[in-house]
Design a protein with these regions (language model features):
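A short glycine-rich, Lys/Arg-flanked "PGG" loop and its adjoining helix->strand segment in the class I
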Residues: 114-129
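Short alpha-helix
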Residues: 156-172
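Class I SAM-dependent methyltransferase SAM/SAH-binding core
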Residues: 32-36, 40-90
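Conserved alpha-helix/loop element of class I SAM-dependent methyltransferases that forms part
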Residues: 11-29
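A short SAM/SAH-binding and catalytic strip from SAM-dependent methyltransferases
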Residues: 100-112
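C-terminal helical/coil "lid" or tail adjacent to the Rossmann-like core of SAM-dependent
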Residues: 178-202
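A short acidic, Gly/Pro-enriched loop at the edge of an enzyme's catalytic core
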Residues: 89-100
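Short, glycine-/aromatic-enriched active-site segment of Class I SAM-dependent methyltransferases
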Residues: 135-155
Length: 202
């Protein structure tokens, strides 16, 4: 499944970021996991193949849902991964349905953060875990459009890390780990963008 990573881990940080989140999430084989904004289900296939857990994917785009289902079949993981078309603000799942909710770079597309986190809290079992990776607005930073997730300011719902943490607390979550990796990400991005030294071929 990881051979598809360039195609199906199209969030910030790609497969590397998914692996880092996996290390923190402490997901067990017996857990039922929900991946919100699953896209082509790359992280879901990573989880299912690495851990043997069952994953439900929630995705708004019918095309992504169809692509995810196809890739699940081609990789032999369709028995462990189910794909649902729907909104993160009105999830088609009962209360207390999942041990873990997984989400990568979805919040900046959603204006109503309180509704989003309330829905996540609703579908989590008591004592369940919410593992997520999110872009955050920097202090005093200016956004230049178009962005990867927004063509103009009306589509951009980026908030600060502090606001995210506050709304999570209001929604009933207790933070076991809330880590700002902005500096590390910036360092990696700068290093990746640096030109390689020129060499002479003889």
């Amino acid at each position: 499944a990881e051979a598809l990573a360039a195609l199906d881990h199209f969030h910030t940080g790609g497969l590397r970021a998914s692996r880092e989140l996996l290390e923190l999430a402490q997901i067990r084989a017996e857990d039922r996991v929900l991946d919100i904004g699953a896209g082509l289900a790359g992280p879901a296939r990573m989880l299912a193949s690495a851990l043997g857990c069952r994953v439900a994917c929630l995705e708004m785009s019918p095309d992504y849902c169809a692509g995810a289902a196809l890739l699940n079949r081609l990789t032999g993981l369709e028995e462990r991964i189910e794909v649902h078309e729907g909104s993160a603000l009105d999830m088609p799942f009962p209360d207390d349905a999942f041990d873990v909710v997984w989400m990568q770079n979805v919040g900046m597309n959603i204006a109503d953060k309180r509704k989003l986190y309330a829905e996540i809290h609703r579908v989590l079992k008591p004592g369940g875990r919410f593992a997520f990776q999110e872009m955050a607005a920097g202090k005093g930073a200016t956004s230049y459009f178009p962005l990867p997730w927004a063509t103009d300011p009306a589509e951009n719902f980026l908030v600060s890390a502090e606001e995210t943490r506050s709304v999570l607390g209001e929604s009933g979550f207790i933070a076991e780990l809330f880590e700002d990796t902005s500096d590390a990400h910036l360092s990696r991005t700068t290093a990746d963008a640096a030109p390689s030294p020129l060499t002479l071929g003889v």
